[in-house]
């Protein structure tokens, strides 16, 4: 699979994450067919060609942490988008994965 093909598969997976839920970079990598490529998921999302359509704000680190380098407005923007969808937070930088993790691939 080329990196371009992988990026498109990442976008397809992320488009399936329901509003009010989150997935981890590793989870998206697994579902996109490259289970050890969480970092490349980050690269793909940073290059998101359709930010209004591909909800990259719904992808977080394995510990629930939101991305300090969120490409579309920083962590405050990511937090605001997630909270607007009803995602609960354990603290200002970590979503409550127990309450809002998308179960696909687990």
For each feature predicted by the language model, list its residue ranges:
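Nucleic acid-binding interface residues in structured DNA/RNA-binding domains
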Residues: 1-106
């Amino acid at each position: 699979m080329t990196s371009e093909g992988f990026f498109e598969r990442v976008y397809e997976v992320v488009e399936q994450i329901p509003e009010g839920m989150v997935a981890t970079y590793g989870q998206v990598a697994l579902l996109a067919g490259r289970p050890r490529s969480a970092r490349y998921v980050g690269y793909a999302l940073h290059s998101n060609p359709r930010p209004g359509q591909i909800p990259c704000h719904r992808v977080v680190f394995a510990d629930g942490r939101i991305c300090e380098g969120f490409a579309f407005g920083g962590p405050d923007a990511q937090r605001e988008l997630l909270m607007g969808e009803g995602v609960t937070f354990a603290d200002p930088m970590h979503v409550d994965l127990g309450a809002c993790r998308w179960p696909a691939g687990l």
